[in-house]
């Protein structure tokens, strides 16, 4: 017996078709409950390897494992219903060979049930992207500042701020598009360059510290909610939840210590005979 859902999720081809149209809205999520909230308003939910920083307190995304990504991908899939869920391929899961990348991507998609994967890199990863897409794996690219390369970059600095440095970044964008990616994240790239790339390539660009001209935007949820103590220049704080959460925890601790909580309304009495 076949089972058909009454709610249709967005797909990679549908996001590709948004090129030049209504901007694509994308946020990160790593949990079922935040995924349910994000799902109401976003086209794409990214299960980013930024979970290493946000959930686990790592200084970089390098320590994140494939199993960690799959586990949180499952949670986000259970919490969401309509958004396309994209799961990051973590450092070390795809760089060795295109075959390694395929096996990792298949694990992610089969075990999390997500709709696409994302990987970092341009020209050097084009062959891998093509290999995956030709075998049924939708791929979102990621160029510009690539956080998984922090140990070779040396710092999280914006890219392409001198026009003489534009060539390699433009080449990365073209390579990702021509390899069959359905979209590409452009991170921390000079605004004029990001706008030019958006105009020049045929797939949607998703900006993060890039340009309002991009075909969509993405932020880390905890950054835009004001839950992170520090956020990059490109983050706008759409909320300030950190102080409110701290105040609630402070009040809870105070009421427990003073025995004000739990009150009569929070406990169970005996059944009347």
From Swiss-Prot:
Gene3D superfamilies: Phosphoenolpyruvate-binding domains (3.20.20.60). It is found in: Cytoplasm. GO terms for biological process: pantothenate biosynthetic process. It catalyses: 3-methyl-2-oxobutanoate + (6R)-5,10-methylene-5,6,7,8-tetrahydrofolate + H2O = 2-dehydropantoate + (6S)-5,6,7,8-tetrahydrofolate. Pathway: Cofactor biosynthesis; (R)-pantothenate biosynthesis; (R)-pantoate from 3-methyl-2-oxobutanoate: step 1/2. GO terms for molecular function: 3-methyl-2-oxobutanoate hydroxymethyltransferase activity; magnesium ion binding. The keyword Metal-binding applies. GO terms for cellular component: cytoplasm. It comes from the Bacteria. Its EC number is 2.1.2.11. Its cofactor is Mg(2+). Binds 1 Mg(2+) ion per subunit. The active site is at residue 187. 3-methyl-2-oxobutanoate binds at residues 49-50, 88, 118. The keyword Magnesium applies. Its main location: cytoplasm. Keywords: Cytoplasm, Magnesium, Metal-binding, Pantothenate biosynthesis, Transferase. Homodecamer; pentamer of dimers. This is 3-methyl-2-oxobutanoate hydroxymethyltransferase. It comes from Rhodopseudomonas palustris (strain BisA53).
């Amino acid at each position: 017996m076949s089972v058909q859902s009454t709610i249709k999720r967005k797909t990679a081809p549908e996001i590709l078709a948004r090129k030049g149209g209504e901007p694509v809205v994308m946020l990160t999520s790593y949990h079922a409950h935040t995924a349910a909230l994000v799902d109401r308003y976003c086209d794409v939910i990214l299960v980013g390897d930024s979970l290493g920083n946000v959930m686990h307190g790592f200084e970089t995304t390098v320590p994140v494992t494939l199993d960690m990504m799959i586990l949180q991908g499952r949670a986000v899939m259970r919490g969401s219903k309509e958004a396309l869920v994209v799961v990051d391929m973590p450092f070390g899961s795809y760089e060795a060979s295109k075959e390694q990348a395929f096996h990792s991507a298949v694990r992610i998609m089969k075990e999390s049930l997500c709709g696409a994967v994302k990987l970092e890199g341009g020209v050097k990863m084009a062959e891998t992207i093509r290999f995956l897409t030709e075998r049924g794996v939708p791929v979102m690219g990621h160029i510009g500042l690539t956080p998984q390369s922090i140990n070779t970059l040396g710092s999280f600095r914006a890219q392409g701020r001198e026009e003489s440095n534009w060539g390699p970044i433009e080449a990365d964008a073209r390579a990702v598009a021509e390899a069959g990616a359905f979209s590409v994240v452009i991170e921390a790239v000079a605004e004029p360059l990001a706008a030019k790339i958006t105009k020049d390539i045929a797939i949607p660009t998703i900006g993060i510290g890039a340009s309002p001209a991009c075909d969509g935007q993405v932020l880390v949820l905890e950054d835009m909610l004001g839950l992170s103590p520090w956020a990059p220049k490109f983050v706008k704080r759409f909320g300030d939840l950190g102080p409110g959460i701290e105040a609630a925890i402070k009040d809870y601790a105070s009421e427990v210590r003073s025995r004000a909580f739990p009150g009569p309304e929070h406990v169970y009495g005996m059944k009347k005979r």
